[in-house]
Amino acid sequence: MSKAVVVFSGGQDSTTCLIQALQQFDEVHGITFDYGQRHREEIEIAKELATNLKLASHKVMDVTLLNELAISALTRDSIPVSNELMDNGLPNTFVPGRNILFLTLAGIYAYQLGADTVITGVCETDFSGYPDCRNDFVKAMQAALEQGMDKKLTIQTPLMWLDKAETWALADKFDSLELVRNETLTCYNGIKGDGCGTCPACLLRKRGLEEYLADKEAIQARLSAKCEN
């Protein structure tokens, strides 16, 4: 029996990955992390989606220690979300070590479940300037987890080379565009669906959707070409 663990925030990207995984694996388990995030409404959204999509299991893990260590606009309500980069060239929504921690814990959870695959929705094409969304980082994490647990483990990144328009096309491929558009939470200000429309996450999501809806056939063809390679 094939099993996978999906790092599941309840946002557009992880929900799209989850829907795809349900078509590819016998058992799909979700893991969601509560790190005291600004947009923690996403946790309740993830719970609702996990129930509605009938996951084999859904674990919400308390990792609020990360909030104490990582100062970011996503971990401090007192820091406004900015569309400008900081002096170090990173967005102020970057949470240092977040994906290191998430993938480590997801790998441990997969080990306990007997799953050989961890799936995450990180993307280098539209990676918002986050260094822990890059392919080289994911490869390094996979190698470290395999060495550290002496177990074959694959970290799949279905969206790694897709732009946001192609990610919408992928959701549509599985007849889930409206579900992803209306029932997920990507907004840094915690607003479901199309969100606030002004934060970096909403702007990226909106541009991708507009591009996809303007020329579905071309974007679907582009997605198919990438999936074949």
UniProtKB/Swiss-Prot annotation:
List of residues binding ATP: F8, S9, G10, G11, Q12, D13, S14, T15, T16, C17, L18
CDD domains: QueC-like (cd01995)
Cofactor details (free text): Binds 1 zinc ion per subunit.
EC class name: ligase
Pfam families named in the record: QueC
Binding site for Zn(2+): C187, C196, C199, C202
Keyword Zinc among record annotations: yes
Substrates-to-products reaction catalysed: 7-carboxy-7-deazaguanine + NH4(+) + ATP = 7-cyano-7-deazaguanine + ADP + phosphate + H2O + H(+)
Record key words, sorted: ATP-binding, Ligase, Metal-binding, Nucleotide-binding, Queuosine biosynthesis, Zinc
Molecular-function annotations in GO: ATP binding; ligase activity, forming carbon-nitrogen bonds; zinc ion binding
Residues forming coiled coils: none
Cofactor: Zn(2+)
Family: Belongs to the QueC family.
Pathway in which this enzyme or protein is active: Purine metabolism; 7-cyano-7-deazaguanine biosynthesis
GO biological process: queuosine biosynthetic process
Keyword Hydrolase: no
Function summary: Catalyzes the ATP-dependent conversion of 7-carboxy-7-deazaguanine (CDG) to 7-cyano-7-deazaguanine (preQ(0)).
Enzyme Commission numbers on file: 6.3.4.20
Organism: Shewanella halifaxensis (strain HAW-EB4)
Full protein name: 7-cyano-7-deazaguanine synthase
